[in-house]
C-alpha cells in the first residue's frame, strides 16, 4: 500500500513539474512572436515561432518555417502583425534563420553567455505551455557552439521554440526530435548567420530556398561584391531595391550611384540616371 502511495506521489510531482511555469515565463513571452509564411500567391504556407534578440526587431526562427516562402509576417505578444523586412542569414544544415521585422522597441531576450553543463535545467517556452527537462549530453559545433540533447522528447509543436536556463537567459532553439530525445541548438549559432557575397554551401542552399529580400553584407567592400553578383542574377526590380539600400547605407560611396545610374540607363530612365551621375 505504501509503495503504491509513493509511486502516486512521484507521478503527481512529475506532472506538477511538467506543468509548472518558471517565474520568468510571462516576461519571456513578451519577446516571443508567431510567424506566418506565404507562397508566391499569398497563400499561407506554414506557422511557427520566432523570438527577438535585439531591440531593432532582429529575430530567430526555425528555417523550415521559411523554406520556400515569398513573404512572412510576425505577430507580437500584443497581437500586432508586422512584415518581415529582410532575411539576415540562414543555415539549411542546422535549420536556423535570422531575419529583420518591421518593428521597433521590442524587448529582446538575454542570451546566455556560457554553455550549460550536463544536468542543467532547461525550460522550453511555447505559445501557451512550458516543458522543463535537463541536459543529458552535449556536442560541439564549429568548436564553439553547443548542441544539447535533452532528457526527454517534447511535442512537435515546440519545434523552433526558445529554450531557457534557470536564470531566464536564452540558451537555444528546439531543433529536432530524434528517438526519445529532443535536441536544442545554441542560440549563439546565430552569430554565423549573415549575408555574404560568397556564402557557404549550407547558407547558399538555405537562402536560395527563401524567396524574400536579403539584407546587405555588414561591410562596404563585401557589399560591393554582393552588388556585382546580384547584377548578374537578380531581376531589375530586385536589383534596384538592393542598390537603393546600398546607397542609403553607404551614401558616400560613389560606386553605388554609378551602378544605379547604369541600371536606370538600361531601363531608359535617363533623368534618374543623370541625377545619379551628377
Language-model features, listed with the residues they occupy:
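Bacterial Sec-dependent N-terminal signal peptides
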Residues: 1-23
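A conserved glycine-rich beta-strand in the N-terminal activation segment of trypsin-fold
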Residues: 21, 38-56, 62, 82-83, ...
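Flexible, gly/ser-rich surface segments that form the specificity/activation loops bordering the active-site cleft
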Residues: 21-26, 106-159, 174-185, 196, ...
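C-terminal cap/linker of serine protease catalytic domains
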Residues: 22, 173-238
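A short, Trp-centered hydrophobic/proline-enriched beta-strand micro-motif
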Residues: 26-39, 124
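Conserved active-site neighborhood of the chymotrypsin/trypsin-like protease fold
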Residues: 54-123, 128-132, 144-147
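Short, glycine-anchored, charge-dense loop/turn motifs used at functional sites
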Residues: 56-58, 163-172
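Alpha-helical segment of the N-proximal tetratricopeptide repeat
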Residues: 215-267
